[in-house]
């Protein structure tokens, strides 16, 4: 990755602002005569796309037929301008002060396992019992392996994956216990593919629960972005 000099960083800031001003001017002209239209690029982690966005996209397309959606999936935080992204859905704490954010909601974390795993697993009555169990973690997001438990533990993971959706599938297939957001596993819990374990042992609220939509900070917001956020 190319690193900019101090002069380059300064120029980049002005260039970004100039592009934003041009985009705002174009948007203002569009708003005078027509409904929201054009390309809207939305980025979110794969599990959020599968379980939260996808079920609503058909209705959004019917409501705004002139908006062309482009959905991308990154499980790690991306630079919106670098990836030409209009909106990113982020779960957990926000750090980028150059972004506007709208809170979409809260998705609590749950410790879960498959019934098949629990049939042959050691007893699981308290948090310290986790030491004798297989745990499923994340490879590319170490902070997700620090579970916000009522009693802090040094957890050892038997298997890890880079994608939250892969972690979910590993859990369903009986590879161990994991900690996932409710939006990912609600249907699995209803269907009996997963069950909650050690209920009440996850701290709430915690820094990983909030779900935000973020977009680049400027003096105007495109009608496409507002249409998506308000839908």
What positions do the PLM features span?
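Alpha-helical "hinge/linker" immediately C-terminal to small N-terminal DNA-binding modules
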Residues: 3-31
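Central regulatory/effector-binding core of bacterial HTH transcription factors
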Residues: 37-100
